[in-house]
């Protein structure tokens, strides 16, 4: 029973870490997109895009600041650090590769767009 608990807790930790990585990737990619499209990335825009509350966005941004991926000050735009830009660029390229692959195998564009968003996080580098 004790070994079974250790295995389950290990699996849970793996899933939690994978989800945290996915969130960091999605947020850095979206911050880069917002900066490119509108000139700035704001917490309210992230909240609208991801369909989450302001406090949820603020919590994630604080974590990304601790991880060295973004810079943020209260009531100001959010900026990517050098590391954040590298991650966002990497994720954007990986997303495009998955999307292009889905199109080549005959998946409709609207379906490929949605599916690529989920699949990109499950592709090993």
Where are these regions (language model features)?
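A ubiquitous short alpha-helical element
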Residues: 14-16, 82-87, 100-101
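N-terminal helix-turn-helix DNA-binding core of bacterial DNA-binding proteins
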Residues: 14-52
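Residue-level signal for threonine
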Residues: 21, 80-81, 124
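Canonical helix-turn-helix DNA-binding module
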Residues: 43-78, 82
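Basic, amphipathic "hinge/linker" alpha-helix immediately C-terminal to the N-terminal HTH DNA-binding motif
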Residues: 76-95
